[in-house]
Swiss-Prot record:
Cofactor(s), names only, from the UniProt record: Zn(2+)
UniProt-annotated binding residues for ATP: 269
InterPro entries recorded: Cys-tRNA-ligase, Cys-tRNA-synt_Ia_DALR, Cys-tRNA/MSH_ligase, CysS_C, Rossmann-like_a/b/a_fold, tRNA-synt_1_cat_dom, tRNAsynth_Ia_anticodon-bd
Gene it is expressed from: cysS
Protein's name according to its UniProt entry: Cysteine--tRNA ligase
Enzyme Commission code(s) on record: 6.1.1.16
């Protein structure tokens, strides 16, 4: 029975979907004005893991992850580049899709773009005004009146006065309260705009998600997820909008993944430690990056460093080595089939504890190596597949395409051939020199009756 940590209640809760057997999940996606970074990679991989587990558990899942394709940053970047906004956003949507596919992230059922749902946003704003929870300002903006929603602060666990004291709020004469937030922005020269009852303008960021998830799921659904940085104000404001418009509970379970740090410092462009997914994939295999993310609990901070990625590569190589040594038999996924399957399920049902689930994979690999059991190797591959891992040909992974600074497969084969010739000529010193050179360059040789095989360390 699945239990998950609910940010709203600040405790683990037994998961009970609104409709038995069916789950609706919405995750806040990317604002597409630049290439995706490591923080985006974690959101993608974490909620892909959640989606895979819900489906493996037998749920009929509908997964929606939105795309923000209108935003101040997008408008600014398009102006800097001198290109149309839709050209800029499509380029980065395509790049995002490439990054996600490389990381083994399955596409959500729906990926709505904010610009496709502006009429829905206008309708929700009208509902909020009609209930006295929003107001049109003289300048053409529309604001949410936070004092008119009694539940404001429930997700962050702070009262409105506490939030106001702790936030740096710009004084805006158009607002009734400094904590009021914008629902509709009046048009500015040169910016995209849509007609509305309040004049030409565009939606605020927060209303976009409320309108899109209502379009797919109605006013009440099961799981809403995103990065921890979205808990306040974005998700707090979503609750205010959706519950303020419909006077019913919005979301049953809120999930937030932890931050990524780089060498124990916050990732930021100003510190020069900001990495895009593409930059990381130039150095490391994409499955290694996915494995690195899943080795940590999704709510824990994740520290990125070259040492940690190298450790992840070495660990994943051990699992693939077990599959290379013992060909995997086909096994049907039955959670009561053996103790490994039961413990894997128990780990994942405990708030998606991939740390313990991966530990089960290592136990399986060790036992499969020891017993030479094709069935256990089959379970290793099958359970790994639930996490989106271990589905490649083991030799292909272990010999992998060379990454930045690595020796190529062709060069390895040439050196192995030279070593073979040296051994045939009983030139043991040259044979040892070649082996030592390969070891120094991260290549492990394994001599057997069928010849010499190799893998990356």
């Amino acid at each position: 029975m699945l239990h998950l940590y609910n940010t709203l209640s600040r405790q683990k809760e037994r998961f009970q979907p609104i409709q038995p057997g069916k789950v609706n999940m919405y995750v806040c996606g990317m604002t597409v004005y630049d290439y995706c970074h490591l923080g985006h990679a974690r959101v993608m991989v974490v909620f892909d893991m959640v989606a895979r587990w819900l489906r493996a558990s037998g749920y009929d899942l509908t997964y929606v992850r939105n795309i923000t394709d209108i935003d101040d940053k997008i408008i600014r970047r398009a102006a800097e580049n001198g290109e149309p906004i839709n050209v800029l956003t499509q380029r980065f949507i395509d790049a995002m899709d490439e990054d996600a596919a490389a990381l083994g992230v399955q596409k959500p059922n729906f990926e709505p773009r904010a610009t496709q749902f502006v009429p829905d946003m206008i309708s929700m704003i009208e509902e909020l005004i009609g209930k006295g929870r929003a107001y049109a300002a003289p300048n053409g903006d529309v604001y949410y009146a936070v004092r008119e929603f009694a539940g404001y602060g429930q997700l962050s666990g702070k009262s409105l006065d506490d939030l106001r004291a702790g936030e740096r709020v710009d004084v805006d004469p158009n607002k009734r309260d400094p904590m009021d937030f914008v629902l509709w922005k009046a048009a500015k020269p040169g910016e995209p705009a849509w007609p509305s009852p309040w004049g030409q303008g565009r939606p605020g960021w927060h209303i976009e998600c409320s309108a899109m998830n209502e379009h797919y799921f109605g006013p009440h659904f099961d799981i809403h997820g995103g990065g921890a940085d979205l808990q306040f104000p974005h998700h707090e404001n979503e609750i205010a909008q959706s519950e303020g418009a419909h006077d019913c509970k919005f979301v049953n379970y809120w999930m937030h993944n932890g931050f990524i740090r780089v060498d124990n410092e916050k990732m930021s462009k100003s510190l020069g430690n900001f990495f895009t997914i593409r930059e990381v994939l130039e150095k490391y295999d994409a499955e290694v990056v996915r494995f690195f993310i899943l080795r940590a609990h999704y709510r824990s901070p994740l520290n990125y460093s070259d040492a940690h990625l190298e450790d992840a590569r070495s660990a994943l190589s051990r699992l693939y080595t077990a599959l290379k040594n013992v060909p995997a038999a086909d096994v049907a996924l039955d959670w009561e089939a053996n103790d490994y399957a039961r413990r894997f399920r128990a780990a994942m049902d405990d708030d998606f504890n991939t740390v313990e689930a991966v530990a089960v994979l290592f136990e399986l690999a060790g036992e499969a190596n020891k017993s030479r059991s094709a069935e256990l190797a089959g379970w290793l591959k099958t359970l790994g597949g639930v996490l989106g891992l271990l589905q490649r040909d083991p030799v292909d992974f272990l010999q992998g395409g060379s990454l930045e600074g690595e020796i190529s497969a062709d060069e390895v084969e040439q050196l192995i051939a030279a070593r073979k010739a040296a051994r045939a000529g009983k030139d043991w010193a040259e044979s040892d020199r070649i082996r030592d050179e390969l070891i120094a360059r991260g290549i492990v040789l394994e001599d057997g009756a069928g010849g010499t095989t190799w893998r990356r360390a």
